[in-house]
Amino acid sequence: MTSFAIYVLAALAEIAGCFGFWAWLRLGKSPAWAVLGVLSLVIFALLLTRIEAGAAGRAFAAYGGVYIIASLAWMQVVEGARPDRWDLIGGVICLAGAALILFGPRTN
């Protein structure tokens, strides 16, 4: 599986996990949502360990850009709130930064 695919799956797992707690604590849903949230967050953490990177911090930093784009997509698809142009511009800037971190030339 490619790094990008792992990042996308990790983002969906993290967002779903956090949303489980949001649904429980903010939307008054059943505590079962929190249990699902915990399971999803465990999957998220396991997925990030599959990234090929020389340092954990680099893998996590690059993931941040993908997380932001996935969060904006979640906002529109799941919550029905359309991202505005500033959301989209910010997301593109963050994704460009993530690409530099992940794919930039390295000197040893």
UniProtKB/Swiss-Prot annotation:
Mode of membrane association: Multi-pass membrane protein
GO cellular component, one term: plasma membrane
Main subcellular location of this protein, as a coarse class: membrane
Keyword annotations of the record: Cell inner membrane, Cell membrane, Membrane, Transmembrane, Transmembrane helix
Residue intervals passing through the bilayer: 4-24, 27-47, 59-79, 85-105
Entry's localization field: Cell inner membrane
Listed InterPro entries: UPF0060
Domain of life: Bacteria
NCBIfam families (UniProt xref): PRK02237.1
Family: Belongs to the UPF0060 family.
Name used for this protein in its record: UPF0060 membrane protein CCNA_02055
Organism (species): Caulobacter vibrioides (strain NA1000 / CB15N)
